[in-house]
């Protein structure tokens, strides 16, 4: 492992001293290591990134999401040093950075391949690449009103309901927006997709888990509605068609996981006790 990328979120508290320390830790493990620094993911999706052996993300979970989308087609593994608030995906704290880098070069880690989603818009040129690691969300526009949605799974009608929106999430995204919408926490290596309605106007409409190979069609039934598509809570697009198709992408996010990190411990400390942290916000 000689080619290392570092993707820095410039909105976070990352001093030059921190970056110098990381360079030092890397070169202590491999004096010949070549380090390429990216700022706010700019240039990360270029073909040259294919040569990287791993990318370290300095930021929060949102920075991980952006990095995953940029690198998906290159199969480059990533891991995060948390400089955000929650740090569920960016699970390495700054004080553990040196240990993580040492384990990286010793090969003391595993790689988890996480499902990603793709979205096709009916009748729209596919030049836009709608990839998501967490979720793809279809909601109403600016007006505060509910919208009527019809859901088809593998071209078979599933249900129709009115709601604020619809979330289609991966197992990775099950601890994000869909959790707030009443969806279950899904173990990350399961091959499933989740549909979670947002504030449905019915007591009988609940989240559902589907086979990971399912094709999900969401139709907006009122012609005067201009739905909005949101990718991982970061990319935003007004949709001029009334139907979107969401399915599993051929690309996966490759997350580096170190052996001293336990999923359930992270779940307990980062999610279960989140309410205590929020009291002071």
Swiss-Prot record:
The keyword Kinase applies. The keyword NAD applies. It comes from the Bacteria. It is found in: Cytoplasm. GO terms for biological process: NAD metabolic process; NADP biosynthetic process. NAD(+) binds at residues 61-62, 134-135, 145, 164, 175-180, 234. The active site is at residue 61. One of its GO terms (molecular function) is metal ion binding. It holds the Pfam family NAD_kinase. It catalyses: NAD(+) + ATP = ADP + NADP(+) + H(+). Gene3D superfamilies: Probable inorganic polyphosphate/atp-NAD kinase, domain 1, Probable inorganic polyphosphate/atp-NAD kinase, domain 2. Keywords: ATP-binding, Cytoplasm, Kinase, NAD, NADP, Nucleotide-binding, Transferase. Disulfide bonds: none annotated. Its cofactor is a divalent metal cation. Transmembrane segments: none annotated. Its EC number is 2.7.1.23. One of its GO terms (cellular component) is cytoplasm. SUPFAM superfamilies: NAD kinase/diacylglycerol kinase-like. Involved in the regulation of the intracellular balance of NAD and NADP, and is a key enzyme in the biosynthesis of NADP. Catalyzes specifically the phosphorylation on 2'-hydroxyl of the adenosine moiety of NAD to yield NADP. Belongs to the NAD kinase family. This is NAD kinase.
């Amino acid at each position: 492992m000689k080619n290392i990328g570092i993707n820095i979120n410039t909105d976070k508290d990352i001093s030059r001293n921190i970056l110098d320390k990381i360079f030092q830790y890397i070169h202590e493990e491999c004096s010949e290591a070549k380090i390429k620094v990216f700022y706010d993911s700019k240039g990360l999706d270029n073909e040259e990134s294919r040569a990287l052996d791993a990318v370290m993300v300095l930021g929060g979970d949102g920075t991980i999401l952006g990095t995953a989308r940029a690198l998906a087609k290159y199969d480059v593994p990533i891991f995060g040093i948390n400089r955000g608030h929650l740090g569920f995906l960016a699970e390495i704290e700054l004080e553990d950075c040196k240990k993580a880098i040492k384990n990286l070069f010793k090969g003391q880690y595993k790689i988890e391949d996480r499902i990603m989603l793709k979205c096709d818009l009916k009748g729209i040129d596919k030049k836009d690449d709608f990839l998501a690691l967490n979720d793809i969300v279809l909601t109403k526009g600016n007006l505060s009103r509910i919208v009527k949605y019809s859901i088809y799974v593998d071209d078979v009608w599933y249900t129709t309901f009115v709601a604020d929106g619809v979330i289609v999430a991966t197992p990775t995204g099950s601890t994000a927006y869909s959790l707030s919408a009443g969806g279950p926490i899904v173990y990350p290596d399961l091959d499933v997709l989740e549909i979670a309605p947002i504030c449905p106007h019915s007591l009988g409409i609940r989240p559902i888990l589907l086979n990971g190979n399912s094709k999900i069609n969401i139709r907006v039934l009122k012609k005067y509605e201009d739905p909005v598509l949101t990718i991982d809570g970061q990319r935003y697009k007004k949709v001029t068609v009334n139907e979107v198709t969401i399915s599993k992408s051929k690309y996966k996010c490759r997350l580096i996981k170190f052996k001293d990190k336990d999923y359930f411990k992270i779940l307990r400390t980062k999610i279960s006790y989140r309410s205590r942290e929020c009291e002071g916000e």
